[in-house]
Amino acid sequence: MRVTQLSSQSFIFPSPELALREPNGLLALGGDLTAPRLLAAYQRGIFPWFNPGEMILWWSPDPRAVLFPEDLHISRSMRRFIRHCPYRFTLNHAFADVISACATERDEGTWIGRDVQQAYCQLHALGHAHSLEVWLENELVGGLYGVAVGAVFCGESMFSRADNASKSALMVFCHHFTQHGGELIDCQVLNAHTASLGAVEIPRNFFLQQLSQLQFSPLPAECWLPQSLIFHPRCSKDQPFKTPHIRLYPPLAGRLILLKW
């Protein structure tokens, strides 16, 4: 099966069902990173991922890694840490700094080149891409960013420069996201870090069904306003975090070998 070459004159993508099995999820190549094309991709469960300086590649892997916010796994040590958390958290205060940090903090190299950073900063300016920042006093020590598609948040990357900074960021984001009606976080591809936090793999067709419904459930505008976030963990020494419920899915075929978050 051949990979589709995208037209520069159209934002139409091929069906995700046409994606390759190896490499898992490769669907199309070419095109550009303009805001209309990126939005068209995310609305169809497709995302860009490529090495800086090379041709743009578009992916829709099967299975798909997702995190249901209520299933976020919080270890005992993290529970203790968050009770006395030294950080403060903000939303959409320093998007460009967060994506730049995500690009520079990767020892194994990064897919977040300058063109990607500029493209997502444009999405942020248009109100579609968002960041959560973690501060220690006045220093940015952690954060994450991604793209909102209705009640789905497509997580792109996160970084940490201090103990538990990225984990704290995800905890605070999940709380804020669900408080405003968010239902699903797209992690795209599974890795050890996201799996340890509760991300799971589900069949692509199930993910696309969820996306097709939830993208038409926009969250209230105040969800994404620049703001400081205060997180009150739902636990104490005598009241643990709730136990995640178990979800069952059809059998999964194939495993991902890609790493992203």
Swiss-Prot record:
Q: Name one GO biological process term.
A: protein catabolic process
Identify the keywords attached in UniProt to this record, alphabetized. Answer: Acyltransferase, Cytoplasm, Transferase
Record keywords: GTP-binding included?
A: no
Function, as annotated, reads: Functions in the N-end rule pathway of protein degradation where it conjugates Leu, Phe and, less efficiently, Met from aminoacyl-tRNAs to the N-termini of proteins containing an N-terminal arginine or lysine.
Keyword Acyltransferase applies: yes
**Source species:** Yersinia pestis bv. Antiqua (strain Antiqua)
Give the E.C. number(s): 2.3.2.6
The organism's place on the tree of life at top rank = Bacteria
Instruction: List the subcellular locations.
Output: Cytoplasm
Q: Show the GO cellular component annotation of the record.
A: cytoplasm
Reactions accelerated catalytically = N-terminal L-lysyl-[protein] + L-leucyl-tRNA(Leu) = N-terminal L-leucyl-L-lysyl-[protein] + tRNA(Leu) + H(+); N-terminal L-arginyl-[protein] + L-leucyl-tRNA(Leu) = N-terminal L-leucyl-L-arginyl-[protein] + tRNA(Leu) + H(+); L-phenylalanyl-tRNA(Phe) + an N-terminal L-alpha-aminoacyl-[protein] = an N-terminal L-phenylalanyl-L-alpha-aminoacyl-[protein] + tRNA(Phe)
What top-level class of enzyme does the UniProt entry assign? transferase
MF terms in GO: leucyl-tRNA--protein transferase activity
User: Under which name does UniProt file this protein?
Assistant: Leucyl/phenylalanyl-tRNA--protein transferase
